[in-house]
Amino acid sequence: MAPAATAAAPRLLRAAMLLLLLVAAGRRAAGAPVVNELRCQCLQTLQGIHLKNIQSVKVTTPGPHCDQTEVIASLKTGQEVCLNPTAPMVKKIIDKMLNKASAN
């Protein structure tokens, strides 16, 4: 090899290793959860809905993703709606659904 080629080899190797590390770091970051996915699901809530339309209810307690309690009702039509957890009608719906689940 020529002296110039021998001197350039370590630089080329260093550049290739750096590129490999950057690609590996980029792929790892692509699989990490995005911060904006960790947010409240309910932007608007309903004060209530008729119990006969509800198939199931999911209550999400406050946590790092959202600082408020969320009540999400799955309707028999397949639609999901957010309910106001402090509304009296919603509290009754949750109680009835819990009693129904404990009876089964």
Swiss-Prot record:
CDD domains given in the database record: Chemokine_CXC
Keyword set includes Translocase: no
Disulfide bonds: C40-C66, C42-C82
Secretion signal span: 1-30
Locations listed in the record: Secreted
GO molecular function terms attached to this record: chemokine activity; growth factor activity
One annotated Gene Ontology cellular component of this protein: extracellular space
InterPro entries to which the protein is assigned, alphabetical: Chemokine_b/g/d, Chemokine_CXC, Chemokine_CXC_CS, Chemokine_IL8-like_dom, CXC_Chemokine_domain, Interleukin_8-like_sf
Organism: Bos taurus
GO biological process assignments: immune response; inflammatory response
Entry's family note: Belongs to the intercrine alpha (chemokine CxC) family.
PROSITE patterns in the record: SMALL_CYTOKINES_CXC (PS00471)
Annotated Pfam families: IL8 (PF00048)
Cited SMART domains: SCY (SM00199)
Alphabetic keyword roster: Cytokine, Disulfide bond, Growth factor, Inflammatory response, Secreted, Signal
Protein known as: Growth-regulated protein homolog beta
Main location: secreted
Top-level taxon of origin: Eukaryota
